[in-house]
Protein backbone atom coordinates (compact mmCIF):
# COMPACT_ATOMS: atom_id res chain seq x y z
CA UNK A 1 0.00 0.00 0.00
CA UNK A 2 1.42 3.37 -1.04
CA UNK A 3 0.19 6.68 0.34
CA UNK A 4 1.38 10.28 0.28
CA UNK A 5 1.75 11.66 3.81
CA UNK A 6 0.35 15.15 4.49
CA UNK A 7 3.83 16.11 5.67
CA UNK A 8 4.98 15.88 2.05
CA UNK A 9 2.14 17.40 0.05
CA UNK A 10 -0.92 17.68 2.32
CA UNK A 11 -2.09 20.10 4.99
CA UNK A 12 1.35 20.27 6.63
CA UNK A 13 2.74 21.70 3.40
CA UNK A 14 0.00 24.29 2.78
CA UNK A 15 -3.68 24.80 2.09
CA UNK A 16 -5.32 21.77 0.51
CA UNK A 17 -7.72 21.69 -2.40
CA UNK A 18 -10.00 23.53 -3.07
CA UNK A 19 -8.42 26.29 -0.96
CA UNK A 20 -4.90 25.63 -2.18
CA UNK A 21 -2.76 23.29 -4.27
CA UNK A 22 -2.00 20.62 -1.68
CA UNK A 23 -3.43 17.10 -1.53
CA UNK A 24 -6.76 16.70 0.33
CA UNK A 25 -7.58 13.89 2.73
CA UNK A 26 -9.07 11.67 0.02
CA UNK A 27 -6.47 12.45 -2.65
CA UNK A 28 -4.59 9.46 -4.10
CA UNK A 29 -1.23 9.76 -5.80
CA UNK A 30 -1.04 8.40 -9.33
CA UNK A 31 2.12 7.00 -10.78
CA UNK A 32 3.76 4.01 -12.39
CA UNK A 33 5.34 1.09 -10.54
CA UNK A 34 6.88 -0.35 -13.68
CA UNK A 35 10.57 -1.12 -13.15
CA UNK A 36 11.70 1.55 -15.62
CA UNK A 37 15.36 1.57 -14.53
CA UNK A 38 15.48 -1.96 -15.98
CA UNK A 39 13.80 -0.88 -19.20
CA UNK A 40 10.95 1.52 -20.00
CA UNK A 41 8.20 1.00 -22.54
CA UNK A 42 5.90 -1.93 -23.18
CA UNK A 43 6.78 -4.61 -20.61
CA UNK A 44 5.93 -7.34 -23.11
CA UNK A 45 8.22 -6.19 -25.97
CA UNK A 46 11.59 -5.24 -24.45
CA UNK A 47 14.01 -3.87 -27.02
CA UNK A 48 11.64 -3.99 -30.00
CA UNK A 49 8.75 -1.82 -31.11
CA UNK A 50 5.33 -2.96 -29.93
CA UNK A 51 3.89 -3.29 -33.42
CA UNK A 52 0.88 -5.41 -34.22
CA UNK A 53 3.00 -8.39 -35.25
CA UNK A 54 5.72 -8.05 -32.58
CA UNK A 55 6.55 -11.14 -30.54
CA UNK A 56 5.34 -10.60 -26.97
CA UNK A 57 6.34 -12.06 -23.63
CA UNK A 58 3.81 -13.68 -21.37
CA UNK A 59 2.81 -11.34 -18.54
CA UNK A 60 4.36 -13.74 -16.02
CA UNK A 61 7.71 -13.44 -17.83
CA UNK A 62 7.78 -9.63 -18.05
CA UNK A 63 10.64 -8.46 -15.83
CA UNK A 64 9.39 -4.90 -15.34
CA UNK A 65 5.94 -5.82 -14.00
CA UNK A 66 6.07 -5.90 -10.21
CA UNK A 67 5.39 -9.28 -8.65
CA UNK A 68 3.97 -7.72 -5.47
CA UNK A 69 0.43 -6.31 -5.87
CA UNK A 70 0.45 -2.54 -5.39
CA UNK A 71 -2.42 -0.22 -4.51
CA UNK A 72 -2.18 3.53 -3.82
CA UNK A 73 -4.46 4.88 -1.08
CA UNK A 74 -5.20 8.30 0.41
CA UNK A 75 -3.72 9.45 3.71
CA UNK A 76 -7.27 9.45 5.04
CA UNK A 77 -7.46 5.70 4.42
CA UNK A 78 -3.89 5.16 5.61
CA UNK A 79 -4.44 6.83 8.99
CA UNK A 80 -6.44 4.07 10.76
CA UNK A 81 -4.05 1.42 9.42
CA UNK A 82 -0.98 3.25 10.69
CA UNK A 83 -2.69 4.10 13.97
CA UNK A 84 -3.29 0.40 14.64
CA UNK A 85 0.39 -0.51 14.25
CA UNK A 86 2.42 -1.39 17.31
CA UNK A 87 6.09 -1.92 17.91
CA UNK A 88 8.89 0.58 18.46
CA UNK A 89 8.58 4.25 17.59
CA UNK A 90 9.53 5.18 14.06
CA UNK A 91 12.69 7.29 13.67
CA UNK A 92 11.91 10.99 13.73
CA UNK A 93 12.61 11.52 10.03
CA UNK A 94 10.21 8.65 9.19
CA UNK A 95 7.28 10.32 10.95
CA UNK A 96 4.65 12.20 9.01
CA UNK A 97 2.04 14.77 9.92
CA UNK A 98 -0.95 12.55 10.69
CA UNK A 99 -2.30 12.92 14.28
CA UNK A 100 -1.01 9.50 15.32
CA UNK A 101 2.07 7.93 16.87
CA UNK A 102 4.14 6.52 14.00
CA UNK A 103 5.42 3.03 14.80
CA UNK A 104 7.36 0.41 12.87
CA UNK A 105 5.08 -2.56 13.62
CA UNK A 106 4.04 -5.19 14.03
CA UNK A 107 0.64 -4.99 15.67
CA UNK A 108 -2.91 -6.33 15.69
CA UNK A 109 -3.97 -4.62 12.45
CA UNK A 110 -4.79 -6.92 9.54
CA UNK A 111 -5.59 -5.75 6.03
CA UNK A 112 -7.30 -7.72 3.30
CA UNK A 113 -6.12 -6.31 -0.03
CA UNK A 114 -8.21 -7.03 -3.10
CA UNK A 115 -6.72 -5.74 -6.34
CA UNK A 116 -8.52 -6.16 -9.63
CA UNK A 117 -6.32 -5.62 -12.68
CA UNK A 118 -7.24 -5.62 -16.35
CA UNK A 119 -4.60 -7.27 -18.52
CA UNK A 120 -6.11 -6.58 -21.96
CA UNK A 121 -3.89 -4.99 -24.60
CA UNK A 122 -4.92 -1.52 -25.77
CA UNK A 123 -3.56 0.64 -28.59
CA UNK A 124 -1.65 3.84 -27.94
CA UNK A 125 -1.56 6.74 -30.38
CA UNK A 126 1.55 8.78 -31.10
CA UNK A 127 1.00 11.86 -33.26
CA UNK A 128 3.93 12.43 -35.63
CA UNK A 129 4.46 15.30 -38.10
CA UNK A 130 7.54 15.44 -40.33
CA UNK A 131 9.02 18.41 -42.20
CA UNK A 132 11.57 17.02 -44.72
CA UNK A 133 14.96 18.69 -44.75
CA UNK A 134 16.40 20.16 -47.93
CA UNK A 135 20.18 19.94 -47.48
CA UNK A 136 20.56 17.10 -44.95
CA UNK A 137 17.24 15.22 -45.06
CA UNK A 138 18.86 12.21 -43.39
CA UNK A 139 19.67 14.21 -40.26
CA UNK A 140 16.69 14.28 -37.89
CA UNK A 141 15.93 16.85 -35.21
CA UNK A 142 13.09 15.48 -33.07
CA UNK A 143 10.86 17.57 -30.81
CA UNK A 144 8.65 15.72 -28.34
CA UNK A 145 6.15 16.08 -25.51
CA UNK A 146 3.62 13.55 -24.29
CA UNK A 147 -0.14 14.10 -24.62
CA UNK A 148 -1.52 11.59 -22.08
CA UNK A 149 -2.29 12.52 -18.48
CA UNK A 150 -3.37 10.84 -15.24
CA UNK A 151 -6.30 13.22 -14.85
CA UNK A 152 -6.89 16.50 -16.75
CA UNK A 153 -3.20 17.25 -17.17
CA UNK A 154 -3.18 21.05 -16.80
CA UNK A 155 0.48 21.04 -15.77
CA UNK A 156 1.52 17.58 -16.90
CA UNK A 157 1.57 17.47 -19.93
CA UNK A 158 -0.42 20.47 -21.22
CA UNK A 159 2.03 23.06 -19.87
CA UNK A 160 4.62 21.52 -22.18
CA UNK A 161 2.30 20.45 -24.99
CA UNK A 162 0.84 23.91 -25.69
CA UNK A 163 4.26 25.48 -26.44
CA UNK A 164 5.11 22.55 -28.69
CA UNK A 165 1.89 23.03 -30.66
CA UNK A 166 2.61 26.75 -30.93
CA UNK A 167 6.09 25.98 -32.27
CA UNK A 168 4.58 23.66 -34.87
CA UNK A 169 2.02 26.31 -35.86
CA UNK A 170 4.79 28.89 -36.30
CA UNK A 171 6.84 26.53 -38.47
CA UNK A 172 3.71 25.83 -40.52
CA UNK A 173 3.36 29.55 -41.22
CA UNK A 174 7.01 29.73 -42.27
CA UNK A 175 6.48 26.79 -44.63
CA UNK A 176 3.58 28.62 -46.25
CA UNK A 177 5.92 31.58 -46.81
CA UNK A 178 8.45 29.38 -48.61
CA UNK A 179 10.84 28.56 -45.77
CA UNK A 180 12.28 25.05 -45.65
CA UNK A 181 14.49 23.52 -42.94
CA UNK A 182 18.02 22.36 -43.59
CA UNK A 183 17.53 19.14 -41.61
CA UNK A 184 14.41 17.01 -41.24
CA UNK A 185 12.29 18.14 -38.28
CA UNK A 186 10.01 15.62 -36.60
CA UNK A 187 7.31 16.81 -34.19
CA UNK A 188 6.00 14.09 -31.89
CA UNK A 189 3.25 13.96 -29.31
CA UNK A 190 3.70 10.76 -27.35
CA UNK A 191 1.03 8.59 -25.79
CA UNK A 192 1.44 6.48 -22.65
CA UNK A 193 4.23 8.45 -20.97
CA UNK A 194 2.70 8.26 -17.52
CA UNK A 195 2.43 4.44 -17.31
CA UNK A 196 6.04 3.96 -18.39
CA UNK A 197 7.31 6.08 -21.33
CA UNK A 198 5.40 3.74 -23.62
CA UNK A 199 4.74 5.74 -26.78
CA UNK A 200 8.18 7.32 -27.09
CA UNK A 201 10.03 4.12 -26.25
CA UNK A 202 8.08 2.00 -28.73
CA UNK A 203 8.52 4.58 -31.51
CA UNK A 204 12.24 4.82 -30.76
CA UNK A 205 12.59 1.04 -30.71
CA UNK A 206 10.68 0.73 -33.99
CA UNK A 207 13.00 3.28 -35.64
CA UNK A 208 16.14 2.38 -33.68
CA UNK A 209 18.40 1.65 -36.67
CA UNK A 210 17.47 4.94 -38.34
CA UNK A 211 17.85 6.93 -35.14
CA UNK A 212 21.34 5.57 -34.50
CA UNK A 213 22.51 6.97 -37.85
CA UNK A 214 20.15 9.91 -38.44
CA UNK A 215 19.29 11.23 -34.98
CA UNK A 216 21.01 14.61 -34.50
CA UNK A 217 19.15 15.86 -31.44
CA UNK A 218 16.00 15.21 -29.40
CA UNK A 219 14.35 18.18 -27.64
CA UNK A 220 11.92 17.22 -24.88
CA UNK A 221 9.52 19.14 -22.70
CA UNK A 222 7.00 17.92 -20.14
CA UNK A 223 5.82 20.11 -17.26
CA UNK A 224 6.86 23.64 -18.17
CA UNK A 225 6.52 26.23 -15.40
CA UNK A 226 6.71 29.98 -15.00
CA UNK A 227 10.03 31.18 -13.67
CA UNK A 228 13.66 30.77 -14.58
CA UNK A 229 15.22 28.87 -17.44
CA UNK A 230 16.08 25.34 -16.32
CA UNK A 231 17.77 22.93 -18.70
CA UNK A 232 19.21 19.45 -18.52
CA UNK A 233 20.74 17.48 -21.34
CA UNK A 234 23.85 16.46 -23.22
CA UNK A 235 26.75 18.81 -22.63
CA UNK A 236 27.60 18.73 -26.33
CA UNK A 237 24.58 21.06 -26.74
CA UNK A 238 25.66 23.52 -24.03
CA UNK A 239 27.12 26.13 -26.40
CA UNK A 240 24.06 25.95 -28.65
CA UNK A 241 21.62 26.32 -25.75
CA UNK A 242 23.51 29.30 -24.36
CA UNK A 243 23.22 31.04 -27.72
CA UNK A 244 19.48 30.45 -27.81
CA UNK A 245 19.07 31.66 -24.22
CA UNK A 246 20.87 34.90 -25.07
CA UNK A 247 18.50 35.50 -27.99
CA UNK A 248 15.26 35.01 -26.00
CA UNK A 249 13.86 37.94 -24.01
CA UNK A 250 12.22 37.21 -20.69
CA UNK A 251 8.80 38.93 -20.93
CA UNK A 252 8.71 39.87 -17.24
CA UNK A 253 12.12 41.49 -16.79
CA UNK A 254 13.02 42.21 -20.45
CA UNK A 255 16.41 40.67 -19.79
CA UNK A 256 17.63 37.78 -21.88
CA UNK A 257 16.66 34.38 -20.52
CA UNK A 258 20.40 33.76 -20.13
CA UNK A 259 20.95 36.92 -18.04
CA UNK A 260 17.93 36.32 -15.81
CA UNK A 261 19.05 32.75 -15.12
CA UNK A 262 22.55 33.97 -14.27
CA UNK A 263 21.16 36.57 -11.86
CA UNK A 264 18.95 33.96 -10.19
CA UNK A 265 21.98 31.71 -9.69
CA UNK A 266 23.93 34.57 -8.14
CA UNK A 267 21.03 35.52 -5.86
CA UNK A 268 19.98 32.05 -4.75
CA UNK A 269 22.98 29.77 -5.16
CA UNK A 270 25.61 28.62 -2.70
CA UNK A 271 28.88 30.53 -2.45
CA UNK A 272 30.53 28.18 -4.95
CA UNK A 273 27.55 28.40 -7.33
CA UNK A 274 27.55 32.21 -7.15
CA UNK A 275 31.25 32.38 -7.92
CA UNK A 276 30.84 29.92 -10.78
CA UNK A 277 27.93 31.92 -12.24
CA UNK A 278 29.99 35.14 -12.15
CA UNK A 279 33.14 33.60 -13.59
CA UNK A 280 31.68 31.44 -16.36
CA UNK A 281 30.85 32.86 -19.77
CA UNK A 282 28.21 30.18 -20.28
CA UNK A 283 25.49 28.65 -18.15
CA UNK A 284 25.79 25.00 -17.30
CA UNK A 285 23.37 22.31 -18.45
CA UNK A 286 22.47 19.80 -15.76
CA UNK A 287 22.93 16.09 -16.39
CA UNK A 288 19.81 14.10 -17.27
CA UNK A 289 18.57 11.12 -15.30
CA UNK A 290 15.35 9.55 -16.51
CA UNK A 291 11.62 9.96 -16.00
CA UNK A 292 10.45 11.49 -19.26
CA UNK A 293 10.38 10.76 -22.98
CA UNK A 294 14.02 11.65 -23.64
CA UNK A 295 15.07 8.38 -22.00
CA UNK A 296 14.91 6.00 -25.00
CA UNK A 297 16.65 8.52 -27.25
CA UNK A 298 19.53 9.45 -24.95
CA UNK A 299 20.08 6.45 -22.71
CA UNK A 300 19.24 3.71 -25.22
CA UNK A 301 20.24 5.11 -28.62
CA UNK A 302 22.77 7.83 -27.80
CA UNK A 303 20.86 10.69 -29.44
CA UNK A 304 21.86 13.96 -27.70
Ranges and model annotations:
Residues 23-89, 136, 190-304:
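Metal-dependent peptidase/peptidase-like ectodomains
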Residues 35-155, 169, 173-177, 277:
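Soluble metallo-hydrolase cores and metallopeptidase-like ectodomains found primarily
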Residues 125-127, 139-175, 181-205, 217-221, ...:
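Extended, hydrophobic alpha-helical segments in both membrane/secreted and soluble proteins
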Residues 106, 177-183, 210-214, 259:
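Short helix-terminating capping/connector loops at secondary-structure junctions
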Residues 5-9, 31-37, 101-103, 159-161, ...:
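Short C-terminal domain-edge/linker segments immediately following a structured domain
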Residues 1-26, 134-140, 150, 165-175:
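A conserved hydrophobic secondary-structure block that centers on an alpha-helix together
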Amino acid sequence: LIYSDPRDDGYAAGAVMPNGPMRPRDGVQRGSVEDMPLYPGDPLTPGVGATKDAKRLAVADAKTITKIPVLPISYGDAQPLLDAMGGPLAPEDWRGALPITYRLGAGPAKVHLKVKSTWTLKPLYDVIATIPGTTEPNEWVIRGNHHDAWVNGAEDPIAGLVPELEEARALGELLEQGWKPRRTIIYAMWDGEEPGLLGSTEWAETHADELRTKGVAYLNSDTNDRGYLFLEGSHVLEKFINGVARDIEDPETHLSAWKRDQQAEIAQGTADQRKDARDRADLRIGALGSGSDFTPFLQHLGVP
